Each structure stands twice: as structure tokens, then as C-alpha cells.
């Protein structure tokens, strides 16, 4: 399928064959030239997928995933899109033999049909490059799959068929391959589901159970609305002092995560894993890998409103160590009290401000949040700057984002099902962004599930196949209120 350059479009699944192949049609707001495949039964229209997983690699390449087993990739900044979803014909199972080596076998569409690859809701996705990516399903059993060839083939690297398993977030460090998956408490054990990887998601193991993943109250769990309830704070890999060039390593992983509960809290947990050489009788060395252990576990109260369905839905970490969290209650999308919080210094979330009664709230429920790199004067000078607005809850309607920015500021953007907001002061004050036509002619749709920045663009995905990619130059010119 060949389509012209587009920024906003709806991906609609039109038909699914017996083997689960996806046929895609695109309905776009901008000019499109494509061959649309008709629905065989117009009386039963097939709804487009909802996208919640988003991984942006650069200004050209991004992966996103969602319901109906859908995985999409662009490698040219949105000019064209590849539908690379796992199917019964391109998916294999990965197994580990007693000697620790991994082997695979083909997926059987008959015996393995209960897995229903094409029905999974892939709520989070991580990609290392244009070829290598990992996807995570949420709800109704758990699957983690990996591709090494840009989605042509997939390998199932983790399964859990317990009815009460629900995975929420996936994070992997692109340099070391160390990562983690976080899930809701499992009824049979009452602990958070937690997995780790050290090989870029090719294999996964359970993290040790302890106080660190025991829910603080009866409501504490996490939300898979954007895959951003988990962040990697720091990773350190140190070689053994006596063996600088060998494989013996000490690996330290520090993560932060937050969700819902009676009183939502932010967890900072540090894990340590050691890899040692053990001497054998023939004077050779064996590689012994220990299970990660918890070195420290901090629990920090958050000024986010709690209760059923309420809490932190998304977080982001800036390059200077500031944390920003958004949330609310998805059943009450217009309720803004306690829907956002920010860390008060570059301390990775050791102290938080905001929440109930704080004037710098978002416009309601928000599930995704992201923060840009610093914006410098040369970018600002290319846009006219109206009179600077006053901070606080009452804001004029005739100003642009550019009027808020000083050289060196970062632009924080958050979005949800009922709108989007922006901040120039690391989440202290938020401004609503109405739907509007941008200076480039693009139309800003307004509401999404997840967002992420590349160096020159803001990317967003949402319900009903919604996607948008906006140049930061357009972002600076957007009207706010």
C-alpha cells in the first residue's frame, strides 16, 4: 500500500482472513492516495484499533501498538506505514533447554489457537532500532513477543496464562539490554507481577518476591493506558576488578513506578545482579549468574487523588532528573483535582508537589506525558512572541505556546481521552490546547492516549486508530488557553 505524506490518520481494520492476516484501510484528514479494501459485511463495521503503545526512535522511525493484535511501524516520518502484526504464520515459541540454550518451534494455529495473537491488546512496545522490537500484551493472559527483522517474524519469549495476570508497562535500556516489566498484583500471591531481562527482551525471568512488590493497600495496582507507569532511573554495569575483560559483571537497575490506590505512592527500587566466574576442576571457569536482589526500596507519597480507578496513569523523566506524573480517573475525565504532580527538583521523584487544590492542574484525566529537550533561542526567534501571559489558573485565550518559553526551557506535553495540556515550567503550571489548525495546515485533533518526543517532533497515538506527528515548530505556534 502506497500513501502520500500524512500527519493525522485513522488506521481501520477492514477484514481479517482465516489465518488472521490484517487488511488495512486508511481514512485520513490530509490528502491520501491508496487502495481501500471494502468491508465484506457493511452491516457489521469493524472498529479500528486503539493505540496505547508508542516507541519513538528518532524523527523518522516510530513503532506503535494496540488492540486487535496490531503493530505499526514507520521509518520515514509517517509518509508510509508498515502493518507488522504477529500472525499465526510468522510467529514462533522460544524455549529454554536444560543446558540454558534457547530453541524455538513454530506456532501452531490449531493447538495454540487459544493464544489468539490477532486478538491481543499490545499495550506497550519497546524498540531498539528499525528491526528489533518487543511488545507486551495486557489482560486475558500475558504474552511478550520479540522481532529481530522489523516485524516479518515474531518470537513468543514469555507467556503466563493465569486469569489474574495483567501486565501494565515495559521498559528496556537500549545500551545495556537490561529492562523490566511491571504488572498488577496477582491474586494467588498478592504481589505485583514483575519480570526482568538482561538481553534486550529475548528472555524474561521473575524478579524476587518481597516487601518491595507487596501492594500498600487493597486498591494499589497500575494502569496500562500508555505503558508509562514504569520508568528506568539508572543502570550501572561494572566489570569485576580482577577481570576487566571477562564476562563477570555487577548490574544495578534502579526503577520508579506508580499507579493507583487509596493513597497513590511512588516506588523507587534498586536491584543488583552479579555474574561470577566459578572455577571448575579442569581449571576452566563457568559463568554463574545470580538472581537480582533488592538493594533498596523507597516509598514516597504522591499528591495524586486516589480511590477506585484513580491514580497515576503516566510518568516521564527529563534528562536532568525531573519526574512528572499525570493521571486522574478515566471514568471522570473532566475531573482535574489531583490529576497531576511534579518532582520539585532534579531528584528522580524523591519529593513531589501538585495535586488537589494546586492551581497548576491539567484539564482532567491524562494518560500520557512526555518532556522535550531544551528549547533554545534560535527556535524561539522564528516565531512571533505575543505578550507573555500570567501564570495561574486563569489564562487568556489569545496566546501561543511560544509566549511561555524562555531559552533553555523544556516543553512538557500531556494528553488524555478528553484533551491535551502543555507546560513550560516542568509541570508547575499547565495550559489547555484546544483543537485547531496549525500554521503548517495540519489539524490538531486534541485527545490521545500516549505521546513521545523525538528531537524535532511530537508524536501521539490514541483511540480509534488515531495518530499524529507535529513538528516542534508547529507546537510553538499553537494557541493555548
Which residues fall in each region the model found?
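Cleavable N-terminal signal peptides
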Residues: 26, 36-37
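N-terminal secretory signal peptides that target proteins for export/translocation
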Residues: 1-16
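Residue-level hotspots at or immediately adjacent to binding/recognition sites across diverse folds
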Residues: 37-481
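Bacterial N-terminal signal peptides
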Residues: 21-31
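N-terminal leader/targeting signatures
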Residues: 5, 17-18, 25, 281
Amino acid at each position: 500500500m502506497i500513501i502520500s505524506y500524512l500527519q493525522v490518520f485513522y488506521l481501520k481494520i477492514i477484514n481479517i482472513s482465516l489465518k488472521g492476516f490484517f487488511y488495512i484501510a486508511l481514512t485520513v484528514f490530509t490528502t491520501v492516495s491508496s487502495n481501500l479494501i471494502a468491508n465484506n459485511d457493511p452491516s457489521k463495521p469493524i472498529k479500528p484499533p486503539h493505540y496505547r503503545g508508542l516507541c519513538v526512535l528518532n524523527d523518522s522511525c516510530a513503532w506503535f501498538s494496540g488492540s486487535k493484535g496490531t503493530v505499526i511501524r514507520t521509518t520515514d516520518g509517517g509518509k508510509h506505514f508498515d502493518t507488522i502484526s504477529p500472525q499465526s504464520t510468522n510467529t514462533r515459541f522460544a524455549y529454554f533447554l536444560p543446558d540454558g540454550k534457547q530453541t524455538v518451534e513454530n506456532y501452531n494455529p490449531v493447538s495454540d489457537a487459544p493464544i489468539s495473537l490477532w486478538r491481543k491488546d499490545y499495550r506497550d512496545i519497546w524498540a531498539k532500532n528499525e528491526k528489533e522490537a518487543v511488545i507486551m500484551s495486557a489482560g486475558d493472559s500475558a504474552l511478550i513477543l520479540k522481532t529481530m527483522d522489523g516485524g516479518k517474524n515474531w518470537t513468543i519469549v514469555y507467556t503466563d496464562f493465569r486469569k489474574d495476570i495483567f501486565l501494565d508497562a515495559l521498559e528496556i535500556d537500549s545500551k545495556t539490554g537490561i529492562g523490566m516489566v511491571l504488572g498488577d498484583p496477582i491474586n494467588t500471591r498478592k504481589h505485583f507481577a514483575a519480570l526482568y531481562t538482561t538481553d534486550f527482551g529475548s528472555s524474561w525471568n521473575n524478579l524476587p518476591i518481597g516487601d518491595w512488590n507487596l501492594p500498600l493497600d487493597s486498591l494499589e495496582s497500575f494502569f496500562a493506558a500508555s505503558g508509562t507507569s514504569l520508568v528506568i532511573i539508572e543502570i550501572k554495569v561494572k566489570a569485576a576488578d580482577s577481570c576487566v575483560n571477562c564476562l563477570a559483571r555487577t548490574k544495578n537497575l534502579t526503577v520508579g513506578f506508580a499507579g493507583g490506590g487509596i493513597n497513590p505512592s511512588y516506588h523507587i527500587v534498586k536491584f543488583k545482579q552479579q555474574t561470577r566466574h566459578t572455577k571448575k576442576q579442569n581449571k576452566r571457569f563457568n559463568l554463574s549468574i545470580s538472581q537480582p536482589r533488592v538493594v533498596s526500596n523507597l516509598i514516597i507519597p504522591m499528591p495524586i487523588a486516589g480511590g477506585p480507578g484513580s491514580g497515576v496513569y503516566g510518568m516521564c523523566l527529563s534528562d536532568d532528573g525531573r519526574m512528572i506524573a499525570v493521571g486522574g480517573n478515566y471514568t471522570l475525565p473532566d475531573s482535574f483535582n489531583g490529576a497531576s504532580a511534579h518532582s520539585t527538583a532534579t531528584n528522580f521523584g524523591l519529593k513531589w508537589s501538585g495535586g488537589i487544590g494546586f492551581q497548576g492542574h491539567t484539564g482532567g484525566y491524562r494518560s500520557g506525558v512526555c518532556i522535550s529537550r531544551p528549547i533554545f533561542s534560535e527556535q524561539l526567534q522564528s516565531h512571533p512572541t505575543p505578550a507573555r501571559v500570567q501564570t495561574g489558573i486563569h489564562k487568556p485565550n489569545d496566546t501561543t505556546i511560544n509566549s511561555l518559553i524562555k531559552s533553555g526551557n523544556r516543553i512538557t506535553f500531556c494528553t488524555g481521552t478528553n484533551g491535551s495540556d502543555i507546560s513550560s515550567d516542568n509541570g508547575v503550571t499547565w495550559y489547555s490546547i484546544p483543537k485547531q489548525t496549525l500554521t503548517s495546515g495540519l489539524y490538531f485533533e486534541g485527545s490521545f492516549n500516549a505521546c513521545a518526543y523525538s528531537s524535532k517532533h511530537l508524536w501521539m497515538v490514541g483511540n480509534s486508530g488515531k495518530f499524529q506527528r507535529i513538528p516542534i515548530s508547529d507546537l510553538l505556534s499553537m494557541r493555548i488557553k
